[in-house]
Amino acid sequence: MTDAIVKGLSTFQQVLVWIINLFWLYQFIISITSLIKFKEKPMLTDKKHRFIIALPANNEENVIGNLIKSLKMQDYDKSLFDIYVIADNCTDNTAEVARENGVIVYERFDETKKTKGYALNWFLDKMKDKKDDYDALLVFDADNVVDKNFLNVMNKKLCQGEVLVQGYRDIKNPTDTWVSGGYAIFYWTMNRLYHLARYNMGLSPLINGTAFMVKWDLLIDEGWNTKTLTEDIEFALINISKGVKLGWAKDAIVYDEQPLTFKESWKQRERWSVRTYSMC
């Protein structure tokens, strides 16, 4: 009996090792394609598209102004994009700061529905009368700073026929502490060896919470009907299941602020893990 148990455990261990090895072999093969420079997709049109930019914000009075200023400095025709701040359950001066920076503000108060997914769905419902006014939606987190060429790059992606595209999430504070430095290494690795690699292979990367574009007609009729707390991943998977191929824009750069202390990082990672588990 004991020999049978030992043999069973040994077999289980070997199977587990093979599964892990196959997983890492799969990751290695995909990551190799990140080193290959592929020919760009052909331009299907040379249109200058019109963008609606949504900035969901909950008590972000200290950072929202910097984001708006970076968007207003875009090297893109200013008449072709509108900036909306969704002040979501704010108890500070986020809405006032946004208005002072000259953008349109929508204030939302619903203590039972607090996530970004609910805020985006609520906002899109308000925008249904603007169905024909825009070509694509861009979404950013309130603590971001956006590279001046972001809209030009996303416009090019639309001209190439892309409909759902993730931008390059870089780090605003990589040298502040060892924690933020660790985040920087993580995102740099993911950007190169996951997002770019999968895109080069014709596979879909995932939406990463901020700095992404969705073609307007893909979104405006159905809204942002996600049910979980990881609304970005859920939205990506819903569209992948419908046959939508997600795109990757390595030159559409946004700078994102990361935690400085281990305690802040632990809380964030714990929150992300719980939210990801809720999708299972």
Describe the function of each predicted region.
Residues 65, 92-99, 149:
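Acidic helix N-cap motif at the loop->helix transition within catalytic regions
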Residues 131-145:
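Short beta-strand-to-loop acidic/aromatic patch adjacent to the donor-nucleotide binding site
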Residues 49-52, 82, 234:
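Cell-envelope/extracellular polymer assembly enzymes that use nucleotide-activated donors
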Residues 69-80:
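Short, acidic, metal-binding catalytic loop of nucleotide-sugar glycosyltransferases
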Residues 141-145, 225, 239:
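The conserved acidic donor/metal-binding loop of glycosyltransferases
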Residues 1-47:
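N-terminal membrane-anchoring/stem segments of glycan-assembly enzymes
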Residues 107-130, 148-228, 266, 270-280:
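Long helical/loop segments within the catalytic core of UDP-sugar-dependent glycosyltransferases
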Residues 87-95, 110-112, 145:
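A conserved acidic beta->alpha catalytic loop
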